[in-house]
Amino acid sequence: MSVDLATVKRVARLARIAVSEDEANRMVGELNGILGFVEQLSEVNVDGVEAMTSVTPTAMKKRTDEVTDGSKAADIVANAPVTDHNFFLVPKVVE
């Protein structure tokens, strides 16, 4: 795949970026260079290579799944104008 001047201008217009003619011509070469590097990466054989999520091998620590109220209900409703038993009270809007 290659990028031409019309594509650069179209993308710049869609991104609402002001690009001069000289800048657009320079970007054509830069974008084609980037796409060349991406094409090289797609040629690498990665069969049997496990996907990496980190540079160092790590295992996520698991915690027990416990349901709690968070012990913060009073703090959460502290600034509410009207509450009842740690619930927000709001005016009725639907009859």
From Swiss-Prot:
Matches recorded under Pfam families: GatC (PF02686)
EC number per UniProt: 6.3.5.-
One GO term of the biological process aspect: glutaminyl-tRNAGln biosynthesis via transamidation
Class in the EC hierarchy, top level: ligase
Key word Cell membrane present: no
Molecular function as annotated in GO: asparaginyl-tRNA synthase (glutamine-hydrolyzing) activity; ATP binding; glutaminyl-tRNA synthase (glutamine-hydrolyzing) activity
Keywords: ATP-binding, Ligase, Nucleotide-binding, Protein biosynthesis
Catalytic activity line of the entry: L-glutamyl-tRNA(Gln) + L-glutamine + ATP + H2O = L-glutaminyl-tRNA(Gln) + L-glutamate + ADP + phosphate + H(+); L-aspartyl-tRNA(Asn) + L-glutamine + ATP + H2O = L-asparaginyl-tRNA(Asn) + L-glutamate + ADP + phosphate + 2 H(+)
Domain of life: Bacteria
Subunit structure as annotated in this protein's UniProt entry: Heterotrimer of A, B and C subunits.
Family the UniProt entry places it in: Belongs to the GatC family.
Function per UniProt: Allows the formation of correctly charged Asn-tRNA(Asn) or Gln-tRNA(Gln) through the transamidation of misacylated Asp-tRNA(Asn) or Glu-tRNA(Gln) in organisms which lack either or both of asparaginyl-tRNA or glutaminyl-tRNA synthetases. The reaction takes place in the presence of glutamine and ATP through an activated phospho-Asp-tRNA(Asn) or phospho-Glu-tRNA(Gln).
UniProt name for this protein: Aspartyl/glutamyl-tRNA(Asn/Gln) amidotransferase subunit C
Organism: Rhizobium johnstonii (strain DSM 114642 / LMG 32736 / 3841) (Rhizobium leguminosarum bv. viciae)
Native organism taxonomy: Bacteria, Pseudomonadati, Pseudomonadota, Alphaproteobacteria, Hyphomicrobiales
